[in-house]
């Protein structure tokens, strides 16, 4: 299977969200990546349920919703109701992670677990069978436009080995600082999904940039 590209709307022009959605619809992108931040788990506040409900009216591709919030289990049904197809929670923010992943799946969504850069992939082992997607942060979460942490490669290789050994088809997603400079090596290490924000939306031709990432 070819790798997937998920442009992150955190880096988009919020004053022209409908146009940004139409651009992604017409591109080679596979998913929309939506970062929800609460100003508590991460030091920033982005957008939430009402904005995603609006975005969903203009999208033709799956919504990959990444919750950077405390107590994510409180909002599972709310995000399902506004169109989330994949719902990812942070291992660092979930007290009862196994229960939360089961609840996400019961609502018909794919269940994802995100890891901050300092979190060891071995912590995923108890819930790996319940996890459809692992979102590996390659920057410290909270702000777009940060530099890629190159230690991510080793973590991807280790996680891929765990997935293969367990006989699972869990996808590995890389989120943070992704550009064409890092994409090929990430894919070779085992990444399945590349989230790209500033690299796409700040480029002169976002559609072409997405296409180039897809062809790598």
Regions found by a protein language model. Give the residues of each.
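Active-site/ligand-binding-proximal alpha/beta "capping" segment
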Residues: 140, 147-193
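Conserved N-terminal beta1-alpha1 strand-loop-helix module at the mouth
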Residues: 1-88, 93-96, 103-106, 111, ...
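Short, acidic/turn-prone active-site loops that include or flank metal/cofactor-
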Residues: 92-94, 116-118, 139-142, 198-201
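Short acidic loop-to-helix transition motifs that present clustered carboxylates
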Residues: 118-120, 179
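Short beta-strand segments at enzyme active-site cores
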Residues: 32-35, 172-174, 196
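Conserved beta-strand segments that form the floor/walls of ligand-binding pockets within enzyme
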Residues: 4, 114, 135-138, 173, ...
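Predominantly soluble domains enriched in secretory-pathway, periplasmic, or organellar proteins
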Residues: 101-103, 119
């Amino acid at each position: 299977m070819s790798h997937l590209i998920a442009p992150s709307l955190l880096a988009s022009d919020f004053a022209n969200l409908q146009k940004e959605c139409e651009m992604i619809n017409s591109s080679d992108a596979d998913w929309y990546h939506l970062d929800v931040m609460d100003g508590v788990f991460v030091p920033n506040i982005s957008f939430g349920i009402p904005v995603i409900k609006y975005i969903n009216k203009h999208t033709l591709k799956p919504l990959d919703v990444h919750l950077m919030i405390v107590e994510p289990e409180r909002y599972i049904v709310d995000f399902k109701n506004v169109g989330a197809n994949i719902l990812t929670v942070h291992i660092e923010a979930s007290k009862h992670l196994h229960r939360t992943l089961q609840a996400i799946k019961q609502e018909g969504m794919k269940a994802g677990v995100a890891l901050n850069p300092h979190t060891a992939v071995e912590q995923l082992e108890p819930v790996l069978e319940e996890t459809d997607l692992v979102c590996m942060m390659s920057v410290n979460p909270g702000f777009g436009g940060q530099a890629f942490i190159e230690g991510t490669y080793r973590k991807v290789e280790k996680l891929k080995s765990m997935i293969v050994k367990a006989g699972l088809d869990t996808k590995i997603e890389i989120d943070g600082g992704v550009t064409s400079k890092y994409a090929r090596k990430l894919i070779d290490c085992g990444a399945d999904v590349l989230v790209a924000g500033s690299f796409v939306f700040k480029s002169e031709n976002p559609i072409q940039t997405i296409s180039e990432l897809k062809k790598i």
